[in-house]
Design a protein with these regions (language model features):
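Juxtamembrane helix-boundary/capping and inter-helix hinge elements in multi-pass membrane proteins
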Residues: 67-74, 109, 187-191, 199-202, ...
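Signature of multi-pass transmembrane helix bundles
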Residues: 3-9, 13, 20-28, 32, ...
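Transmembrane helix boundary and interhelical junction motifs in multipass membrane proteins
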Residues: 55-59, 218, 289-297, 328-333, ...
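Transmembrane alpha-helical segments and their short flanking loops
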Residues: 332-458
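Membrane-water interface of transmembrane alpha-helices in multipass transporters/channels
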Residues: 32-39, 76, 232-241, 268-275, ...
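Small-residue-enriched core segments of transmembrane alpha-helices in multipass membrane transport
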Residues: 81-91, 200-202, 240-256, 276-283, ...
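Helix-loop-helix junctions within the multi-pass membrane cores of secondary transporters/permeases
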Residues: 144, 279-362, 416
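Membrane-interface alpha-helices at helix entry/exit sites of multi-pass transporters
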Residues: 74-81, 206, 210, 306-320, ...
Length: 458
């Protein structure tokens, strides 16, 4: 699998380079007709259409299956602490990314009415196809008592709202989360619904695997189209600003966000963690894979952070799978950047939808292979933003991914430290009662079980 992933990534980078080169040749050396340009554009649109077709179902089923997979009776306090930490750290990462990208690249004025209307859609099923938008319009005042000769204005500004085409991701995520909780509370009676949501989610991910093999070809044509359409070369400067925002977001989350969360729960010096796990961070920066870095991360947590070996080997694989802070920052910043590039005024509803969708995409990162380029398109199409411009991000996404992975691993290490601290009383009780019991029995007391009641392998 690792070799297949490597070949895929290399082919993607190769097609990006070829697409840029071909685009420059066609633009400056071999001008083409509008018909040929439209054919090239159509080949790239095939990729966007395929991803858009399954983007919304993937998000909805991921939320429902993820929530229903949480069974506190089986997983105990550790699972609850993991859920709280992952949600909290991801929310912090997304908030930092949004704050920076909206501050450095300001968007338009926000409308809170859109947020409230989309938060509680009239119909869960209609939310798949339309969302609420409002705008300020000028309307005439029809009043016979108005003295027009006096120079009084006969118009006023009024907020007008209506439902428009495009999925309401905010409403879908809220209601998917609610449905997941209700199904989970049904216990055994909801088992059929749980299995149906999980199998549908797995089926969509399998379809995505096949779609992603077309991605290098689609990206090739998208890059050609993007180069042909470039008229203002200030986009290069905008890309530089984007990279600055990303690295600033990584730094703020790593140096300020995570340490504050760690200190709030443990009341211990958070900066000792950096020295204890620096080997794992260097490995993550080199390999750009949280899974490949896991053995080194385990070693650092067990030997340097002094986390209980049994606890670490059972919880760290889970945390490293669903906790993707670096990716969350990248996705939310990239999505807002694309909107600003297209001169789209983002309402509060759009901003919240982008944040929630980025968080959900980061939770499911391990379930969708080669997610880097695909996730950006997934988020943009899910919230109704133009995904065609995402090709410009492919030029440096592979480079930023190395640093995003380092932030992911650092977040995992902080999380293990927090969860281990909160569960230390349970660990002591297990140590006292461990005599005469097998290792398997002890692990079952500490484990977070998958829905099929099998231990998650370390």
């Amino acid at each position: 699998m690792a070799n297949i992933t490597t070949v895929y990534q290399r082919s993607l980078l190769t097609m990006i380079a070829l697409g840029i080169g071909t685009g420059f040749l066609l633009k400056f050396r071999f001008p083409i007709s509008e018909t040929t340009e439209s054919l090239i554009d159509m080949a790239g649109d095939v990729l966007l259409t395929l991803l858009q077709m399954f983007a919304v179902p993937l998000i909805v089923t991921s939320v429902i299956s993820g929530v229903t997979a949480l069974n506190t009776k089986l997983s105990g306090k550790a699972a609850v602490y993991i859920l709280i930490y992952v949600c909290g750290s991801t929310a912090t990462a997304v908030s930092i990314g949004l704050f920076l990208v909206l501050t450095i690249e300001p968007g338009a004025d926000t409308e809170t009415e859109d947020f409230e209307s989309n938060m509680a859609p009239e119909s869960f099923f209609l939310a798949f196809f339309e969302h609420y938008e409002s705008e300020v319009v000028e309307v005439s005042l029809i009043d016979n008592n108005i003295d027009y000769e006096s120079g009084q204005n006969d118009t006023e500004l009024k907020i007008k709202g209506e439902y428009v085409d495009g999925a309401n991701m905010l409403g879908l995520i809220v209601w998917s989360f609610t449905i997941g909780i209700l199904i989970n509370r049904a216990g055994r009676r909801g088992k059929v619904a749980v299995n149906a949501a999980r199998e549908l989610n797995n089926a969509i991910k399998i379809i995505f695997k096949y779609i992603l093999w077309y991605m290098p070809i689609g990206i090739y044509f998208l890059m050609i189209t993007h180069v042909l359409e470039i008229e203002d070369w200030t986009e290069v400067i905008k890309l530089g600003k984007l990279i600055m925002v990303l690295f600033l977001g990584f730094a703020v989350h790593s140096i300020i966000g995570l340490p504050i969360i760690y200190f709030a729960f443990t009341r211990e010096n958070p900066f000792l963690i950096y020295r204890q796990v620096y080997k794992a961070l260097i490995n993550a920066l080199t390999m750009a894979s949280s899974s490949a870095t896991l053995p080194v991360t385990l070693q650092c947590c067990e030997e340097n952070m002094k986390v209980d070996v049994r606890f670490c080997r059972l919880t760290l694989p889970i945390v490293s799978t669903i906790n993707m802070n670096g990716m969350a920052i990248y996705e939310v910043v990239a999505a807002v950047f694309i909107a600003e590039l297209a001169h789209i005024n983002l309402s509060a509803s759009y901003i919240i939808s982008i944040g929630l969708t980025s968080a959900v995409a980061s939770f499911g990162a391990a379930g969708v292979p080669m997610l880097g380029p695909a996730s950006t398109i997934l988020i943009l199409t899910s919230v109704g933003l133009p995904a065609k411009d995402v090709s410009i991000l492919m030029v440096f996404e592979w480079f930023v991914d190395h640093f995003a992975t380092m932030v992911n691993v650092l977040g995992d290490c902080f999380g293990i430290g927090i969860i281990s601290h909160l569960c230390q009383n349970e660990l002591k009780e297990l140590d006292h009662s461990a005599s005469g019991r097998s290792i398997v029995q002890i692990e079952l007391d500490l484990s977070c079980l998958e829905p099929n009641d099998q231990l998650i392998p370390s």
